[in-house]
Design a protein with these regions (language model features):
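Hydrophobic/aromatic beta-strand patches that form the interior of the parallel beta-sheet core
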Residues: 62, 99-101, 125
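Glycine-rich, charge-decorated loop segments at or immediately adjacent to ligand/cofactor-binding or catalytic sites
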Residues: 106-118
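Conserved TIR/SEFIR loop-to-helix hotspot centered on a Trp-containing motif
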Residues: 67-96, 106-108
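Short glycine/proline- and charge-enriched loop/turn segments
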Residues: 72-73, 116-122
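Short amphipathic alpha-helical segments
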Residues: 22-24, 74-77, 112-114
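Short acidic-hydrophobic, aromatic-tinged amphipathic segments that line or gate anion-handling sites
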Residues: 123-130
């Protein structure tokens, strides 16, 4: 029988606008933490049940906030399929360590609905393609409460200039090449 994995971190993001950024961060952290990342490890079952269970078990909830992340939320306040809002509202209700990662934006929308408005009072590092290593270290050292698992992958100790992939833009390009166009629209 397969052992059930308990996730440390839950990734929430709007497919299409920050998929590549979420994937790049997942690639960097996956050897250090158990991450609930839908395109990697959500299989069959009732989606709401799986998502709620994963949020319940995680310590950290990372939400990638890009320019249009909350457009769907603001346009229809009762959209039952707005998973970004549903996930965020549940994580806030459960008092998870919610870490917003702003992706190429400076501010949150001003008129968020009450069940998720508290996100405006949460802090997180701003996503940075160019200084990706510094961004990841800041996230790990100052925002994540989950403890990293021991690893024998020494790439994180290799100087950036000697790595095969040096920054998030290169990660994203490499990763997006492995996606089909259908994956990007989900």
């Amino acid at each position: 029988m397969e052992q059930e994995i308990i996730h440390d971190i839950f990734f929430s993001y709007r497919h299409g606008n920050s998929s590549g950024d979420a994937r790049a961060l997942h690639e960097r952290l996956k050897n250090l933490y158990e991450i609930s990342f839908d395109v990697e490890n959500i299989y069959s079952g009732e989606l709401p049940d799986i998502l709620y269970k994963r949020i319940d078990e995680c310590t950290d909830f990372i939400i990638f906030v890009a320019k249009d992340t909350f457009d769907r939320t603001l346009n229809s306040l009762d959209d039952k399929d707005d998973w970004v809002r549903i996930e965020l509202a549940y994580a806030l209700k459960c008092n998870k360590n919610v870490i917003p990662i702003k992706v190429r934006i400076d501010d949150f929308p001003r008129n968020l609905p009450p069940d998720i408005a508290q996100i405006c009072h949460k802090s997180g590092p701003k996503y940075d393609d160019y200084y990706f290593d510094a961004f990841v270290e800041k996230l790990r050292n100052y925002f994540l409460k989950s403890k990293a698992k021991p690893t024998y992958d020494f790439e994180e100790y290799i100087p950036v200039e000697k790595r095969k992939v040096k920054n998030a833009a290169e990660y994203r390009e490499t990763i997006l090449q492995s996606f089909s166009p259908i994956d990007l629209l989900r």
